[in-house]
Swiss-Prot record:
Residues 387-402 are annotated as: Catalytic 1. Belongs to the inositol polyphosphate 5-phosphatase family. InterPro entries: Endo/exonu/phosph_ase_sf (IPR036691), IP5P_plant (IPR045849), IPPc (IPR000300). It comes from Arabidopsis thaliana. This is Type I inositol polyphosphate 5-phosphatase 4. Residues 56-67 have a biased composition (Basic and acidic residues). Pfam families: Exo_endo_phos2.
Amino acid sequence: MGDGNLKKSKLSWPKTLVKKWLNIKSKSEDFHADDLDRGEGGGDWRNNVIEREEACSVRKSKTETRSKRNSGRARRNKLDVDPPLDHLRVFTATWNVAGKSPPSYLNLDDWLHTSPPSDIYVLGFQEIVPLNAGNVLGTEDNGPARKWVSLIRRTLNSLPGGSCQTPSPVPHPVAELDSDFEGDSAAGANSLFYHRSRSMRMDASASSLPQQFDRRFSVCDRFMLGDTPDDFYDQSFRYCSSEDEPADSPCHDHYSPVSRTGSFVADDRDKGRDKSKYCLVASKQMVGIFLTVWVKSDLRDSVNNLKVSCVGRGLMGYLGNKGSISISMSVHQTSFCFVCSHLTSGQKEGDELRRNSDVLEILRKTRFPRVNNAGDDKSPQMISEHDRVIWLGDLNYRIALSYRSAKALVEMRDWRALLEKDQLRIEQRKGCVFEGWKEGTIYFPPTYKYSNNSDIYAGDDRLPKAKRRTPAWCDRILWHGSGISQLSYVRGESRFSDHRPVYSLFSVEIESAYRNRIKKSSSYTSSRIEVEELLPQRYGYSELNPY
């Protein structure tokens, strides 16, 4: 059995390589999500969501005729109601983790615990695996992605308070985004997540702990991931690849949560846990780029038209070591698009033009094809067609100053002077990139590049092997569309990577109550239709209508 799976894995490697080199895109349905049929959030991941689409199409085919008649009755009753607006709290974050796999002791509580909890969490990562030839040209390493999902799930489902049946009310903005740069007090008020505890830092003692080994999977292999134990990182759980460890390796003495079929084995105590507060609606990995979207479990049934599109902008302009992952979805009547990107690196003059080209190509090539007979004939097909768009990631735009000049301004905390030389702001003012997009006021220091496990920028320590990089705001969050209000825009202080994570909290308008009213009214018309179908044909609806 094991030899057969190993042979299958080896055969899938050339297939993956050919797909990458010829830029053969995977199906848009290929993403991971919690099983919607399960009562709890910790359900199965699915590599292929065609089953879900087919189930939806079957249900639609059974009710399509009745729905059309119901909508006609609703129009006949003149239910012309303007769609009222509700508000959702949307937490977004981007983090370049420098190719490091998350250890078991990495605590995300301070990162994800907002007050009150958000309705939607959009978490984007870059470099979740090292960008070496094996990962770029060969099979993708899905082990770190599964670890991040397990950590995020455990953290979100430990949020204080229960899940709400209604969207969150509109909170008051933390600070006025147009206030003066010099307003340090305003900046302090705006720093909802600015002061981070040491729980997310990589202390020297923690660094000495043994590292886990990851089993590698091919992106072409179909596998189902079952319930992930909340204490996935318990010492009794350890897994490794037979190719990575010799037969007498200590890791073979531990129970492996990954079976030979590529499935997680749920712990018995995990089967009886309570319903999860949050569920994973979509996650996608492209080499080192990883994007996950989580929603409150009570909001899950309102999410529909989920689609994913990937654009590679790396080697030869096609491979996935650079590029973007975009997730399109609708919440009730409002369409969302979340874009996570890792753009071309480099601080030489002219590199910003390559980043501009990356953005334009991502906007041009990202497509969300409509599914026939799936009820999404009006769903947006391009990023710009969505009602609400949030773009996050390592955009890699630098500061057009020398290292010494930029460092001096950082020490003076003169963010205004630094932002005047920020390449992204410069290119936006020229109209070369992100025209019409918005970004909140930056009150925090540049997020790149830090020395290993320290708060010192690379180059300050003057180590002979240290690469000197001009400090820059590489990690950004922008948005496009009306009905989006930014409540905070801050960075975290984790030393886990040479980048600092960046977070933003939004209040987003959605049209939702209109659907509820139509549903309620259609329930009345549905009952009348059923009565009509049972009566002799000589009686018409107009003769029997008592309303």
